[in-house]
Curated annotation (Swiss-Prot):
Monomer. Mg(2+) binds at residues 176, 196. Its cofactor is Mg(2+). This is GTPase Obg. The keyword Hydrolase applies. GTP binds at residues 169-176, 194-198, 216-219, 286-289, 315-317. It comes from Pseudothermotoga lettingae (strain ATCC BAA-301 / DSM 14385 / NBRC 107922 / TMO). It is an enzyme of class 3 (hydrolase). The gene is obg. One of its GO terms (molecular function) is GTP binding.
Length: 433
């Protein structure tokens, strides 16, 4: 995979569909001259859902499209016909994608299972038609609800690759050669630092029925946890690995001290995330073909005592001991998979559409302006978003509600006089004592 094709962090905008408006309608049939209300409800707005697709390995698609908007619900019609709900917008992301609210940083989901889904924006509830407002004394209501607005938000998507095992170590210790020797991956290999600029994934076959995914992480250097070199751009990709394969150039062919290299990488892992240092590690001494037998045994013994664990000597170039290493990695990966299988797979439950709660009793603010008075408040905004004041009955209901909450008395206290203009949203009214 080329550097420009690997994208592992993006910010996108999502908006769910708005609910459709309810209808004001009455039966109009030949032999029913005074038919009752039959206005249908508006359809619900479509939801925005993210889905983990195992066929994807990068967030590259989001580099070119960053705005995603679901369908609105259709408006209700006469004859009790409800509007069609908007279709949900399902957006595929790679398995291993972490979803965050871009404004708050809150983690909304960790899509670490194939086909796992999460709703990131709920559609608005469709408004009710006038059929719902009929009573024994209010038989011809000319009032219906507007649909609720769908949710909208900015999201940050962060990809953490889902590999079973991750190769870590300094640049030029032979990680790319090792993944090439062990798997079907064919990374670029050269004798200069940072040949690997993006993580490479390879499938390692054990037999016809057994395999695991191995990731070659770009070389780490001292202060990588602080951003040095390729730094922590890629350190997060090993957080999900079951086992870390720490590759060391035992030959010192690059003039490096293999003991110091081991210590630096261990320290950088601990600085970045202490949990990484607790993961199972396999220490691989690569390039054994460049040393004489006696010198090799001496260095392996020194490293084993220092690390206090078994060392696996290999030559990626000559494929020496590669099968032994593959079996050891698979042994640890298999144990991790058994633990994962015992965990229940999350079941996606679609939430209910957004429904704004409107209160009958509420406070509001009155502001004195150059041309009159302005009525404002959270519940005022909610009423205006729910009802169209151009509908006669909706207007009367709204004004009656304001009156019950002390509108006239408060205006009088503010010094209002006959003929003053009172603004409520985009609507203006004439004040009368």
């Amino acid at each position: 995979m080329q550097k420009e094709d690997f994208v592992d962090r993006v910010t996108i905008f999502v908006k769910a569909g708005d609910g459709g408006n309810g209808a004001v309608s009455f039966r109009r049939e030949k032999y029913v001259p005074k038919g009752g209300p039959d206005g249908g409800d508006g359809g619900d707005g479509g939801f925005v859902i993210l889905r983990a697709n195992p066929g994807l390995s990068t967030l590259l698609n989001f580099k070119y499209q960053r705005r995603f908007i679901a369908q609105n619900g259709q408006h209700g019609k006469g004859k009790k016909q409800s509007g069609k709900s908007g279709e949900d917008l399902v957006i595929d992301v790679p398995v291993g994608t972490i979803v965050k609210d871009a404004n708050t940083g809150e983690v909304l989901a960790d899509l670490d299972r194939s086909w796992m889904m999460v709703c990131v924006a709920r559609g608005g509830k469709g408004g009710r038609g006038n059929i719902h407002f009929a009573t024994s004394v209010f038989r011809a209501p000319r009032i219906a609800e507007k649909g609720d607005k769908g949710e909208e938000r900015w999201l940050e998507l962060e990809l953490k690759l889902l590999a079973d095992a991750g190769l870590i170590g300094f640049p030029n210790v032979g990680k790319s050669s090792l993944i090439s020797a062990m798997s079907n991956a064919r990374p670029k290999i050269a004798d200069y630092p940072f040949t690997t600029l993006v993580p490479n994934l390879g499938v390692v076959k054990i037999d016809e029925n057994s395999e695991f995914v191995l990731a070659d992480i770009p070389g780490l250097i001292e202060r990588a946890s602080e951003g040095a070199g390729l730094g922590n751009l890629f350190l997060r990709h090993i957080e999900r690995c079951s086992v870390l394969v720490h590759v060391i150039d035992i030959s010192g062919s690059e003039g490096r001290d293999f003991i110091k290299d081991y210590d630096v990488i261990v320290q950088e892992l601990c600085k970045y995330n202490e949990q990484l240092s607790r993961k199972p590690q396999i220490i691989v001494a690569n390039k054994i073909d460049l040393l004489e037998k006696d010198e090799l045994e001496k260095r392996l013994e020194t490293l084993e005592k220092h690390a206090n664990q078994k060392i696996y000597p290999v030559s990626a170039l000559l494929r020496i001991n590669i099968d032994i290493l593959k079996q050891k990695i698979f042994e640890i990966v298999g144990k991790s998979r058994l633990l994962l299988q015992k965990q229940p797979v999350p079941v996606f439950e679609k939430p209910k559409p957004i429904r704004t709660k409107i209160e009958e009793r509420f406070d509001f603010e009155i502001k004195k302006t150059q041309d009159g008075f302005e009525i404002c408040g959270e519940q005022i905004d909610k009423w205006l978003s729910r009802y169209s004041l151009e509908q006669k009955d909706a207007l009367e209901r709204f004004l009656d509600t304001l009156e019950r909450n002390g509108l006239s008395e408060k205006l009088k206290q503010m010094g209002a006089h006959d003929g003053d203009t009172v603004w409520i949203g985009q609507y203006s009214f004439e004040y009368k004592e």
